[in-house]
Every structure is written in C-alpha cells, then in structure tokens.
C-alpha cells in the first residue's frame, strides 16, 4: 500500500536516537524520549496562497529534518510507525556536509 500526502503535509519516519550516552550508560526504554529527528518519506504537492497559486514545499523526500516533540499525527502504515505533519511543523533540514581533511 502506498500513501500520498495532500496539500502541505509530509510523511516522516522517525530516526531512532542512540541507546547509550557518551559515557557508555545504556538508556532504558522507559527513560527514552521520542526522537525529534526524521527522514521525509513522501510530500504533498504544496499549499495554495490567497490567489489560489500552488506554492511548492521546501522539503523533499529523503531530507533529514528536525521537528517539535509533539508534532504530527502518528500512523501505522505497512507495519511501520510513521508521522504525518504539516511542513510548518518542521524546524529545519539537517544537511550532511562532507568533512574536509586538512593536511598537517
């Protein structure tokens, strides 16, 4: 089954956080917070402005995003837990930058 978001909605898969702290302490499931980072799976066509013109979304499928703790609606699709949210719930896109090694 496929899912196509409408308007300015996006479909997001949460990216699970680390299960250990930097000091090596394992965090139990009961103490974990929901991750606020995810990967965009699908996007809608965009929102319409006052004149009726379609405004495309800034995010695209494959983007890694940050969103609020209580953003979106949780759904289960093909046995996978996903989120549907409006683009306005997205705080920003995480861009992967290539690390540049400096010569010593």
Swiss-Prot record:
Classification via InterPro entries: Chaperonin_GroES, Chaperonin_GroES_sf, Chaprnonin_Cpn10_CS, GroES-like_sf
UniProt subcellular location: Cytoplasm
GO BP: any one term: chaperone cofactor-dependent protein refolding
Matches recorded under PANTHER family: 10 KDA HEAT SHOCK PROTEIN, CO-CHAPERONIN GROES
Biological function: Together with the chaperonin GroEL, plays an essential role in assisting protein folding. The GroEL-GroES system forms a nano-cage that allows encapsulation of the non-native substrate proteins and provides a physical environment optimized to promote and accelerate protein folding. GroES binds to the apical surface of the GroEL ring, thereby capping the opening of the GroEL channel.
Listed NCBIfam families: PRK00364.1-2, PRK00364.1-5, PRK00364.2-2, PRK00364.2-4, PRK00364.2-5
Gene3D superfamilies xref list: GroES chaperonin
Keyword ATP-binding applies: no
One MF term in the entry's GO annotations: metal ion binding
Any one Gene Ontology cellular component term annotated for this protein: cytoplasm
Key word Chaperone present: yes
Keyword terms, alphabetized: Chaperone, Cytoplasm
HAMAP family assigned to the protein according to its UniProt record, in alphabetical order: CH10
Family: Belongs to the GroES chaperonin family.
PROSITE patterns in the cross-refs: CHAPERONINS_CPN10
Designated name of the protein: Co-chaperonin GroES 2
Quaternary structure, from the entry: Heptamer of 7 subunits arranged in a ring. Interacts with the chaperonin GroEL.
Encoding gene per record: groES2
């Amino acid at each position: 089954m496929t899912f196509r978001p409408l308007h300015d909605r996006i479909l997001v898969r949460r990216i699970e956080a680390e299960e250990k702290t930097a000091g090596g302490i394992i965090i139990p499931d009961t103490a974990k917070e929901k991750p606020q980072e995810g990967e965009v799976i699908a996007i809608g066509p965009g929102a319409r402005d006052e004149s009726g013109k379609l405004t495309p979304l800034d995010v695209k499928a494959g983007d890694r995003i940050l969103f609020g703790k209580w953003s979106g609606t949780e759904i289960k699709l093909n046995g996978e837990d996903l989120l549907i949210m409006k683009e306005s719930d997205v705080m920003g896109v995480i861009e992967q930058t290539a690390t540049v090694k400096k010569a010593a």
